[in-house]
Amino acid sequence: MRFTQIVAAALCLGATEAAVAPIDRARKVLGNQHAFDKRDASGDTAKAPKHLTSKNKKFYVDPNSIPGVPFDIGESYAGNLANTPAGNSSLFFWYFPSENPEAKNEITIWLNGGPGCSSMIGLLQENGPFLWQPGTDGPVKNPYAWSKLTNMVWVDQPAGTGFSPGPPTVKDEIDVANQFSDFWKNFMDTFDLHHSDVYLAGESYAGQYIPYIASGMLDRKDSEYFNVQGITIIDPSIGATEVIIDAPSVPALHRFNNIIDLNETFVNDITKKWESCGYKKFMDDALKFPPAGPMTVPGKSAGCDVWDEIIAAVKEVNPCFNIYHLRDNCPSPSNVMNGPKNFFNNKQIQEAIHAHPTDYRLCGESQIFGPHRNDRSVPSSYGPLASVIERTNNTIIAHGDLDFLLFTEGSLASIQNMTWGGLQGFQKEPSDKFYVPYKDGSEVGGAGFVGKTHRERGLTWVTVDLAGHEIPQYAPTAAYRMLEYMLGRVQSLTETH
């Protein structure tokens, strides 16, 4: 190009706009501060505890004593309470009373799954008063802490999990429910919470734990200790593995292969195998509204572990693929809960929260349910879940769409094969839009239309588009809204005002 042409081109450009660096354009729109940088890590003036008594003082946690946390975490109590009448075993808890006046006569229990995974990860990385999440450089206050709404307790259970010393003794979910109920009675006595409304929430294998625990509590017909008013189970394990993992895995692969990026030959081959294993017919039948009738679950056959084959192929393409959040790529973010030097495997922290000295692991190798980790109880959707829905009229099953271990369609298929309130499954396909209001702080959690929701006969179904396995971690505002709904603070998940 001649010099005169270059000058002419420059003059032409100057008539419209000068060259602008793309990063300057981005800064103008987005600002210089990452949304997560807006979260508060400043110190506070400690407040006098309002709930301290002679019965619970040994569990009181100094709010400024947690190593590495540079601010007051608020009033809390932690330690172990017996989970058997004989007192020869115990469960660890961390309890945060709420300052919300509407929480006066209620308490919500949070359980993580596994089996054998500590609920402290829920506290530290999902919905606790302070968070240290993967890829972040330190603890911050959580603007969407569930303790802002209700009295919250995170519990390591069953025995042998996290800070709850073993050996594990449970063989099935009836044992789990009995063990937890014995602990719960001690907890309610210790903190004078008698006659409180009790809510249970959790994720993953807590989809097995919680319906059995709630059912066991309701069976006792004792409102002084066990006044269960509702449950929420997130990305739950509620059905046979063929239903919640294998059958929905290939449809999910087709849906998300623009992200997962497996080649056409593999996708075609695994789809043919999925069809020959009977999974296609099952899913076609399961996702009809209303369902035509009870569905036979395909049995586990040789060569039909299609999810396993998909994951093996995905790992070749993306070595850092995260089954809990399918959009993750390399490098994997650092995580303070991983490895032997994890946050809770610290003598000073263990002393601060009155935990027994423990070589703490997030998900231990303890033999929950015996040496083969074989839970003898049937999946909760075949067992007590329907009864809990009927008896509480307040059950939420929620699913993050980006989970690639337990699939949205698998949970929905389990619901469609379950009978409650005199009918099988949902009679209408879920289609209402789940709305999260815009408010201060939503820049760190999102707002607007975030998924779908549907309610029939006491069961509310919720999906969250941009969340993985742990909805409170990936979509804290959506999780907070669901909690508001379970507690009765809002009457709808679709209202836009």
Swiss-Prot record:
Q: Which reaction does it catalyse?
A: Release of a C-terminal amino acid with broad specificity
Q: Which residues carry attached sugars according to the database record? A: 88, 263, 393, 417
Task: Please name the PROSITE patterns in this protein's record.
Answer: CARBOXYPEPT_SER_HIS, CARBOXYPEPT_SER_SER
Q: What is this protein called?
A: Carboxypeptidase Y homolog ARB_02032
Similarity comment: family membership: Belongs to the peptidase S10 family.
Write out the catalytic residues in the record: 204, 403, 469
Q: Name one GO cellular component term.
A: extracellular region
List, in alphabetical order, the GO biological process terms annotated in this UniProt record: proteolysis
